[in-house]
Amino acid sequence: MKTYLVTGCAGFIGSNFVHYMLEKYEDIRLVNLDKLTYAGNLENLQDIEDDARHIFVQGDICDKALVTDLIAKYDPDYVINFAAESHVDRSIKNPEIFVESNVLGTVNLLQCCKDAWYDAAAKTWKEGKKYLQVSTDEVYGALGAEGYFMETTPLCPHSPYSASKASADMFVKAFHDTYGMPMNITRCSNNYGPYQFPEKLIPLLINNAKQHKTLPVYGDGMQIRDGLYVMDHCKAIDMVANGGKDGEVYNVGGHNERPNIFIVKTVIAQLHDRLKDEGISEELITHVADRLGHDRRYGIDPTKIKEDLGWYPETPFEKGIVLTIDWYLAHPDWMAHVTSGDYQKYYEQMYKNK
């Protein structure tokens, strides 16, 4: 039986990964660590809380004693780090929080893994161990009208968020280059799907449109993103963990490039038709001042992961957006719970008077 220590398990991608793995594998143990900050939600794991293969621990990846104890107690074969502050707008207002979680937290995980897995005298690592860092295409910066990010593209982050993720990636590489730590890094394009906190575009649109609230769009809305359905991403992480070549970086993209304004109008049309609600229309769109340092285009070349591991994105945007909207419409209580209290204060801070 393989054991995974999964950090950030109650967040968007982490919780989807936990569901994916438990559905795919019978003989598995997932030790799931999450601090349960604003975007970490135990409701994301509610349907598996009685599954004996799933062990939840509330805690901080910066807590060296806790992480050390978990590795010693459960002896994980893989440590997969999803834990991160991930919203660019928040990073612009509070960059220090992103340094603590994304950089120092990653370094602590690496050091704890090294302490448990590395024999310094023999300069050898325990067999069958691997650290996997889940990263983002934003570490590469922005693209022009043509071309794609490749694993060899230089890192050129533009926001405090992407700078923190790039720094974490470099520490993972440094532990591999310095100590020989077995590791992989995955860099994904923009994920969407169930359990995504509504500070991100698609769930924000769904939540606002249902209430006939304005739909804020940064600038002209022509920023291009490569949409990746979250379960396709989970499959890629599983394949990299179990088959990725040691020390390699793998780009994970959906080949679903769309301008933000196209996504906005698609969500409006879907909700209008589904709910038969004349109040949901493009008149709700409100263009707001563009984000500082807003990257114009992202696009990933996933050739390497296809050739090395046989992964490919199975979900076109036209299917994925329907699955996503269906999920949010079927889970109104989830949305109501996560948008209460502090979320309203955050929303007003981000979009009021823009």
Language-model features, listed with the residues they occupy:
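N-terminal Rossmann-like NAD(P)+-binding domain of SDR-like oxidoreductases, especially those catalyzing
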Residues: 1-191, 241, 323, 331, ...
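C-terminal substrate-binding subdomain of Rossmann-fold SDR/epimerase-dehydratase oxidoreductases
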Residues: 4, 17, 24, 30, ...
